[in-house]
Amino acid sequence: MKNRTEWVMHVWGRKRDSLELNGVEKFHLDMMKKMSKQISKFDKIFVNIAMDDESDDDLYNLLKDEISKVLLCKCVEFNRCQNDPLKCEYVTFRKYVFDRIGEDVNIFYSHFKGYGSNVNVFRSSFPMRILDICEKFWSYSMYMDSLKDFKGVQDVLNGGKSVYCWLMHKDNTIKRPYFESYHSMLQSGNEVYKNLVEDDLCKHSPGSFCWFNMKALKEALKDKPEVVNIDDGYIGYCSNEEKSLYVHFCELYLMNFLKVDDIYSVREYDENWKKVIGVIYCDIYPSKLVCREYLSSFDKYLIETNQI
């Protein structure tokens, strides 16, 4: 019998002046509508809405109702919690993904909002406008690429592979490798795929969209140390300044399973990012290559939907 498959979705219940969806949220809903057939294959979808104001029933119900309309699945469950600006997606990932390592389930973890958090950036001038458009398509290209080959992903995960993610190829396409363990992907992924990726600095580890085989992941990490924790202080360290653009929270919490020396090497990786802060962000971000061909059509989409 195949593993059951669940989708855990983190949603930011962001405060707003009027009770309506913003442009980013509308865009995400529009994308999910296109994937209704694939979405119906999930055994369960769990949506956790991290509210800026947990008591705001009107906003919670708006988000719940609008998201429900596009999630054509036999079992959809919603939950709300208080958003924590420091921990961000941790409020969802820790409890509903990380703490379930070892279960006989395949989990697709994603963010609802994607990378562009404010549609007003599309009214800005170049190059920032290009940058944010690229980021959006990088996110949704991965998202759609994962769901459209649902059976292929299942074959990989049910075969005992523990992590399924994405890398940018030099020919501007997305490659979807899998790894025997999270540790090997985090520490060796760059080396293994260095001939495929455009820039060794642009390592893409599991982040906003990733599949996990929770049972196989526990087996791959069976030698986990007794006491190795990434505490709130380290979360804060990674959340400050522009480094938050490069560090995925999902990656941080799975670091609990790494040896102390490995955590030091990850800290060094963060330090290396400090050295390139002066480099223009869009010059090093991989999405600009992956998504270049989509820019004109996305501009058209924004105009047609009155977002710009």
Placement of each model-derived feature along the sequence:
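ER/Golgi luminal nucleotide-sugar-dependent glycosyltransferases, focusing on the catalytic module
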Residues: 1-308
